[in-house]
Amino acid sequence: MEVDSILGSLSITDDFDQLVDVTSLFDELCSKLKPEAIVKDPRFDLFEGTHSLEVNNSKLDSSLIELTAEEIEFDVNVAYDPPLASVAAIADRLLRCVISWLNDYQTLPTTVLSCRYTESLLSSLVKGTTAGSSWCTGNILYDKVLGSCILGVCYLTKFVQKLLSAGIVFEEEDLNFNNMGFNTFDNLPGQDVVINSLTESLQILEAYSDDSLHLTMLKHILKIIICLVHLEDHLTDYSTKTSHLDELIENANSVNGIFPQLQLSPPKGAFSTYIQKHRSNQFPPRKITKLPTDYSGFITLANDVKTILLVDKAESALETYQFAKFFNKLEQRHVIARILFPLFFIRDDRTVLGKFSYTQFYLLHVKEFSAQTPSEFESSIGNELIQESSNMLLEWYQNCSQNTCRYRQGFNRQLILWDSLQAQFESVNSQVYCSWTYFMKLSSMIEFSLKGFDLDIYKPFEAYSMFWYVYYLSHHLETFLKDSQNDIESNINAIHSMNKKLKKLKAGEKKDQLRLKYRFAMDNEMEQLQATKQFLNYLLKEINITKSLCLIEVFQFAILKSFGLIDNKNSTPSKFSNERLIHNLRFKPFNSIGVPELPEYEVFQQTLKDFVIEEKGAAFDIKLERATNFIETEVRNVVSSIDEIMQGIKGGDNNGVLVTGTRLVQELSLEYYCKLKHTSKALSVNSKVIVNTLKKNIKNKDSHEYKVELVHTTEGWNYFPIQTLRIKQDRYK
């Protein structure tokens, strides 16, 4: 009754006879809509009316934030008792705010800027103060020690702002920097002044005879802040020193050991939403963030930064390529590490790692892939095209550090650019450049497609089309790699044939010239040819693994379709779309790619029909058994190939068969292949479960009770989800 009365109060009029039923008119207009048309009245802009200013709405109007008496009356010029415990509690909470901001993707106003001391310091910078605390309590712990802590955290915040301004990651998506109108970070003193202030505070604490845990905690906090201030060195000096990162880990672990023994409680009002109410705030009000209970976030930060610094030890383009491919692949790295990687790698002096120009770095990739010296083919190519290719390569490297969603989006943009570059190289008859570009394009197309499964972009009914398409791409890449391998073999054999020819020639000028040519080839070409050959062996094994896993997924989909559980069409009917439109939309990123050409919609349909078992009775069982046996064979081959690759990685690429280039990311690459092996075995088990379950239930006519879901195994690789049977649930129960 109460609901009825509320709804009744919303009525336009009490005289319902005056109202007109427009349902039939609405249905009629809807039936005339074209699926591909955007519904918009031509008299209005597309987004007109979607923006509004909300006043007197407590959820949107920050001026309505209610503060407690303690929060309103809090005074930074008061030394709250007990001083040591209070200062330790404030500094501790501030550092955990930093962790929440940087590790948990929280906003600046609900973390670092929620501290009244931070606000006070930043406000004082407006007035021209460039160092020291802006408060005066008469207590050295508050005025000096806490002041240096706040100064250090503000300096770190300034460094993060600098990183964000580089445009590597996306604000609000990777990192929030709502500075509440504070444009004063540039007024902060330099790094030396900040570190000196923190060091002096440490000396003050060392003079204390108190051996309490609060004092120990505060010392560790100061050391942690010093380490955080030193993060800037990796960008300003391109430092590869990790001593401060090791100290950060050590002190964070020490704090984690002390933390449970302390009850830290900052003075009431020291952290609040005060700044959101009183400063320039263009965002809806938010509650203070729930903070982490330890300093593990700093350990993650330090370890991830240490990881990206390893790229400086790369000895070849292959090693930098594999490093970029793996360092952010298994899990998303800390946002600071992800920003630092491209800035450390691609430097302001327009060099890569301070060693190569952009063009040199690009040519190094082409050389190591083709085993040909750049001077042999560079002269015929225009500088503009080389520069464009160099920029494209560097963009690929930068994309590797993006968050997991933007990573796929970056490939989407790059596909058409790789294709365009390939076409331009073909027009000037540069096979070597063209081949490497084709390899990068196909690899990116495969990565882009499979990443969609990791992000749960595809519905179960789309699994067949996507896996078959990746199988199709893998086949093209496999063929290309075999051709490249044959070219390398021919070059190696040509050098060996010189030696045989030398033995047959009589002494003389002709033999001397051939001997010089042979020695030059052995000294300058053979090593690179052998390395390239072994790298191509690795790439062939890797693409065969991808190809086989996709084929297994295709077979499992076909088995499920053979039992009538799934189709490559959406089971939900729609007036505004059809199967061809949905298919074309899914494959739109590949539609403009010239080579390999995107198969027509009918080809996808026909290939699925070829995989599906249409026979009945005993013939059905025979074909089903063949399919499951094929899956078992493919899984064994995949596991065998993975084991060979892992042995090569563990052996440091010294087995004379495979070169993987994973020296700098050995543990990460081994973990990746372990996940891939686990997925392979899970797919094998799943095929048996599918067949046994459906064969048993089809006799009882219960197969219609199942649906198919794409499930990621806990220890597996998400690019290849398991097509799992689930019992249908009545959604209305």
UniProtKB/Swiss-Prot annotation:
<comment type="similarity">
    <text>Belongs to the MAK10 family.</text>
</comment>
<dbReference type="GO" id="GO:0005737">
    <property type="term" value="C:cytoplasm"/>
</dbReference>
<dbReference type="GO" id="GO:0005829">
    <property type="term" value="C:cytosol"/>
</dbReference>
<dbReference type="GO" id="GO:0031417">
    <property type="term" value="C:NatC complex"/>
</dbReference>
<dbReference type="Pfam" id="PF04112">
    <property type="entry name" value="Mak10"/>
</dbReference>
<comment type="subunit">
    <text>Component of the N-terminal acetyltransferase C (NatC) complex, which is composed of MAK3, MAK10 and MAK31.</text>
</comment>
<dbReference type="GO" id="GO:0016236">
    <property type="term" value="P:macroautophagy"/>
</dbReference>
<keyword id="KW-0963">Cytoplasm</keyword>
<dbReference type="InterPro" id="IPR007244">
    <property type="entry name" value="Naa35/Mak10"/>
</dbReference>
<comment type="function">
    <text>Component of the NatC N-terminal acetyltransferase, which catalyzes acetylation of the N-terminus Met of L-A virus Gag protein. MAK10 has a role in the propagation of L-A and M viruses, perhaps in the viral assembly. It is apparently directly needed for optimum respiration.</text>
</comment>
<protein>
    <recommendedName>
        <fullName>N-alpha-acetyltransferase 35, NatC auxiliary subunit</fullName>
    </recommendedName>
</protein>
